[in-house]
Amino acid sequence: MADEAYQCTIVGISGASASGKSLIANTLYRELRAQVGDHNIGIIPEDCYYKDQSDLSMEERYKTNYDHPSSMDHNLLFSHLQALKMGESIELPQYDYVAHTRKPEAIHFAPKRVIILEGILLLTDKRLRQEMDFSIFVDTPLDICLMRRIKRDVHERGRSLDSVIEQYHKTVRPMFLQFIEPSKQYADIIVPRGGKNRVAIDILKAKIGQFCE
């Protein structure tokens, strides 16, 4: 049953692919969770809301532009944020990076005092921006993002080097310039130098921690 008096603060963290936004989000979540407990803070990656492609062949899935807003089920994410703000639990989708589709099983996710939402396309959607109490854009040079993406996708996601570079030039960089970089204007806070900017992390931790009290 929804709790109309429930207070849930949504913090959005966006930026280019491999900009360090996930590192910042996970660092904030891990350190704040140690202070306030699991029941007060949670984290939701936008990647969980890539559209289900189980009806497509693997060849068709490879052709999907995963850096375009149309690849995301923002309708579902929006409805989930509304539910969480009402004190309702959700079933959080899980995405399989190897199969390029949504996993059959979801994870039960209970409402929290603070939810950190992180992803590349969050600030491109006006509805999502309106659900956020404040937002952050991680501003990292694209050449650094590319090197990080190669390391991540080859070693952690089983991709070939050629496929990562081809995707970068074909969709990642063009979509960043068309959608993600322009969305920086909507951020309340700009963080340079990615996830290793400890000063920024400490400032954000103090700010977000206020909402957990």
From Swiss-Prot:
Pathway assigned in UniProt: Pyrimidine metabolism; CTP biosynthesis via salvage pathway; CTP from cytidine: step 1/3; Pyrimidine metabolism; UMP biosynthesis via salvage pathway; UMP from uridine: step 1/1
Q: Name any one GO molecular function.
A: cytidine kinase activity
GO BP, sorted A to Z: CTP salvage; UMP salvage
Query: Which CDD domains does the annotation name?
Result: UMPK
Taking the record's annotation, the residue ranges forming a coiled coil are none
Q: Give the E.C. number(s).
A: 2.7.1.48
Please give the SUPFAM superfamilies that the UniProt record associates with this protein.
P-loop containing nucleoside triphosphate hydrolases
Which locations, inside or outside the cell, does it occupy?
A: Cytoplasm
Location (main, coarse)? cytoplasm
Q: What class of enzyme is it?
A: transferase
Residue sites binding ATP per the record: G15, A16, S17, A18, S19, G20, K21, S22
Which is a Gene Ontology cellular component entry for this protein? cytoplasm
Query: What reaction gets catalysed by this protein?
Result: uridine + ATP = UMP + ADP + H(+); cytidine + ATP = CMP + ADP + H(+)
* UniProt key word Kinase: yes
What UniProt keywords apply to this chain's record, in alphabetical order? ATP-binding, Cytoplasm, Kinase, Nucleotide-binding, Transferase
Q: What protein family does this chain belong to?
A: Belongs to the uridine kinase family.
The cross-references to NCBIfam families, in alphabetical order and at most eight, read:
PRK05480.1 (NF004018), udk (TIGR00235)
How is this protein named in the record? Uridine kinase
Q: Report the source organism.
A: Photorhabdus laumondii subsp. laumondii (strain DSM 15139 / CIP 105565 / TT01)
